[in-house]
Design a protein with these regions (language model features):
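Hydrophobic alpha-helical
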Residues: 1-31
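Hinge/cleft segment of the Venus flytrap/periplasmic-binding protein
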Residues: 51-97
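Structural detector of well-ordered beta-strand residues that form the stable sheet scaffold
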Residues: 18-20, 38, 88
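Sec-exported extracytoplasmic/periplasmic mature domains
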Residues: 4-12, 33, 37, 54-61
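Hinge/beta->alpha junction and helix N-cap segments in small-molecule ligand-binding domains
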Residues: 20-27, 43-51
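Thr-Gly-centered strand-to-loop micro-motif
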Residues: 15, 43, 83
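Short beta-strand elements at the ligand-binding edges of bilobed clamshell
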Residues: 34-46
């Protein structure tokens, strides 16, 4: 949202370029509704937490780290589990309120 504010302070229309954010905060979601933010991404904390707990249990049990998480591991580092970001746009912002 800092980019939106900076553009407004300079008299520029933030709607003239696509500005994106991260975390799908309440302010970010409102900016999408207002048309000043093109999109944000929701980081699924619940999914991250579940995957972390499952990964810890898997390590203790000698199982593959991502087994049972429903997520994939990184191609280059088997200890990174990718919990996908969820894009939030004007089309689905209401789903995140």
């Amino acid at each position: 949202l800092g980019a939106v504010e900076a553009m407004q302070q300079q008299g520029l229309d933030p709607k003239s370029v696509p500005i994106v954010g991260i975390d799908a905060t309440a302010d970010g979601r409102q900016a999408i509704k207002d048309g000043t933010l093109a999109m944000t991404v929701f980081q699924n904390a619940e999914g991250q937490g579940r995957a972390s707990l499952q990964a810890a249990a898997n390590l203790i049990d000698g199982k593959p780290i991502a087994e049972g998480t429903g997520y994939e591991v990184d191609d280059e580092n088997e200890f990174i589990i990718w919990v996908p970001f969820e894009p939030v746009t004007i089309d689905n912002v209401a789903d995140y309120d």
